[in-house]
Amino acid sequence: MSVLDAAEIMDLIPNRYPILFMDKVDELNPGESIVCTKNVTINEEFFQGHFPGNPVMPGVLIIESLAQAASILILKTEKYQGKTAYLGAIDSAKFRKVVRPGDVLKLHVTMEKQRDNMGKVKCEAKVEDKVACSAELTFIVPDPKKKI
């Protein structure tokens, strides 16, 4: 059973197909941690060119998946509700395992620091409990009345 389904996810973040990279939220502790699921299918548009005959999910899209999970965690925190979270920086990104069609990508995000309109999260994307990607992401949640 999911905590948030696809429709509820789309109520929180602005991403839509083909750039929405999560199917459901499995666990959510606002302000602390989140676990989400992305079912990776052969129907993903990026597999047409990455790579024909050897489909592999691009690492940058795994990072984007983690950033979307982080956005949900951030935006479910009371002070950020109704706003948009933006990716500000990627640190210590490591790719350890390829992600292929048929894999279930589990996105684990933990809040590390938070202050004013920014913060840092620690992330891991796992397939069958093996780390495919890890990174630290910095986020910014600007005042919606100000242009960034």
From Swiss-Prot:
**Broad class of enzyme this protein falls into:** lyase
Biological-process GO terms, alphabetical:
fatty acid biosynthetic process; lipid A biosynthetic process
MF-aspect GO terms: (3R)-hydroxyacyl-[acyl-carrier-protein] dehydratase activity
Alphabetical keyword list: Cytoplasm, Lipid A biosynthesis, Lipid biosynthesis, Lipid metabolism, Lyase
Q: Where is the signal peptide?
A: none
What is the annotated localization of this protein? Cytoplasm
Primary subcellular site in the record, as a coarse category: cytoplasm
Q: What does this protein do?
A: Involved in unsaturated fatty acids biosynthesis. Catalyzes the dehydration of short chain beta-hydroxyacyl-ACPs and long chain saturated and unsaturated beta-hydroxyacyl-ACPs.
Q: What's the protein called, per UniProt?
A: 3-hydroxyacyl-[acyl-carrier-protein] dehydratase FabZ
| Organism (species) | Lactobacillus helveticus (strain DPC 4571)
For this protein's source organism, the top of the classification is: Bacteria, Bacillati, Bacillota, Bacilli, Lactobacillales
